[in-house]
């Protein structure tokens, strides 16, 4: 069902507001979740549609609505809110709901300067396509809203001046795994990459912040904490201060 209201899509084009399309997105977010109502999310959103409203604004209102409904009696709204956020993220990163190939994502992000180009030197296209077959984008539905929000805000590679995000959580997990095991023997590394991807994307292990945020980027940060020693001289103290500043800028802890 559509009406005369015109909304603005992410690419800047305009289309008639389609209420059924919005309802379909909310229904998908609630699928399989006990104690969650798509109608209640929509009513609680109380969206006041107007000409020129963006699809991004509509989605953000729906996410807030689901998040506001989280309670001790209805905890599963945290998953509905996360799914709505994941939908928004996919639309921003892929331009549509369905994922692009892992190989194309890597090349795009190398061109943007946010992925380390050495990944294409360490792995063949065929190996990257094999890694792509291991990726399970549906695992994004296992996030709670708080968990996915933290990943989006802190760990996904992005342009923080424009808030443009360049990857999704599952691509992030696979890139981390592929980078960490890139120098392993070729006959073994695909096995280890897959196991590490499964362990992280299924939340069986936690990754230190510097590794999660920077290991796949040109920064190539592996260390979580750095011990900085200083002699009792002005030159050494000033040099230590400069080192601390550089490490802190790259998210390393200082000891």
Question: What are these language model-derived features?
Answer:
Residues 1-255:
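Extended catalytic cores of very large enzyme megasubunits
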